[in-house]
Design a protein with these regions (language model features):
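Structured catalytic core of nucleotide-sugar glycosyltransferases
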Residues: 2-154, 193, 326-327, 332-334
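Acidic-residue sensor for enzyme active/binding pockets
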Residues: 41, 64, 215, 313, ...
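Surface-exposed charge patches
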Residues: 54, 78, 187, 204, ...
Length: 334
């Protein structure tokens, strides 16, 4: 368990806590909440806010931008404090240490009030001018989730194509790009588990739960300032996460489907081996010790797996109850 106790909601003076965030919240509930994880993005935040203001100007969409400072050490929080006087739509939350994009999105979600949420990084590789296009199909009631489809030249294109290709095959998804900006109904966030680094697979998890998904092309630009926080070392982690998500979606709700089948197969092998052993003993007049060991092993392991599947079913039921309780608590806190 991390020593981080949660998001720090502070005012300009150290030690004081604001009731909601570092910025005064608008009185009317917005239609759209833009969630912006930011780790050492002090140079990008002023331009991001300016472009966000321009993007929504004249759109008729009520909005807020929630920046989650994810343990920045470059003065990003100070910049946010300065920006709040210029942009009334800005709200800010601070993590005491880096917790990753998934946790930042979860924190932003807990403080968001819009019925549509948007994940948008602060590095300006995606321009805020595309946000109204992302949210339009959701606000009109056509779909539950919209993901961007990257356009233009960018680093790691080959790796991205392989990753997205594997994801489409594994999860049977109708979209071409999982690792881009996203907009979604807040019910999507209510329904899906967000574990570390699983934000990449929000589309897969949402689609598996029956939410409708579409994509729109969005230009990808060079980073405005700062440096990327992700390198090639993230590739093995991404592959393992992909397999973990697939396993969760396939067997998370019905663990007996996996462990029960494996247990039954091993038990069947044990029974067949036992019958073979009896036949050898009766008709050939001698025993075969390795076959006895195989019978015992198969029966024991098969029984353990089957019982493990039953225990897994009980755990799955408890997880569903906890998830529903958490959703209701989140609604009360909002």
């Amino acid at each position: 368990m991390s020593a981080d106790r949660g998001p720090e909601l502070v005012s300009a003076r150290p030690g004081l806590r604001a009731p909601i965030s570092a910025t005064d919240a608008p009185t009317s509930a917005p239609d759209v909440s833009v969630l912006v994880p930011a780790k050492d993005e002090a140079e990008n935040l002023p331009l991001f806010m300016e472009l966000a203001s321009q993007a929504f100007a004249g759109s008729g969409i009520r909005y807020e931008v929630i920046v989650v400072d994810d343990g920045s050490v470059d003065g990003s929080w100070t910049v946010l404090e300065e920006l709040r006087g210029r942009y009334p739509f800005l709200r800010a939350v601070r993590h005491r240490m880096r917790r990753g994009i998934a946790d930042a999105l979860r924190t932003g979600y807990l403080h968001a009030r819009g019925r549509v949420l948007v994940f948008y990084p602060a590095d300006l590789q995606y321009k805020p001018e595309d946000i109204p296009r992302l949210v339009a199909p959701i606000l009109s009631g056509d779909v539950d989730m919209v993901t961007g489809y990257k356009q233009g030249k960018y680093e790691k294109r080959f790796v991205s194509q392989i990753y997205n290709g594997l994801s489409r095959k594994l999860f049977q998804l109708p979209v071409r790009d999982l690792n881009s900006v996203k907009a979604y109904r807040r019910e999507v966030m209510d329904a899906i588990p967000i574990r570390p680094d699983w934000h990449r697979y929000m589309i897969a998890v949402a689609a598996a739960q029956g939410f409708t998904v579409t994509e729109i092309p969005v230009p990808l630009y060079a980073r405005h300032a700062g440096r990327s926080k992700f390198g090639l070392g993230r590739i093995p982690i991404g592959v393992l996460d992909m397999l973990a998500v697939w396993f969760e979606l396939r067997f998370g709700q019905k663990p007996l489907l996996l462990f029960g089948v494996l247990g039954a197969m091993l038990a069947a092998i044990g029974v067949l081996a036992g019958l073979t052993l009896v036949g050898i003993r009766i008709f050939a007049g001698f025993g075969y010790r390795p076959l006895i060991d195989l019978v015992v092993l198969c029966v024991i392991v098969g029984t353990v797996l089957f019982v493990g599947g039953l225990v897994g079913e009980m755990i799955a039921a408890q997880r569903a109850e906890v998830r529903e309780l958490r959703r209701r608590l989140d609604e009360v806190e909002r």
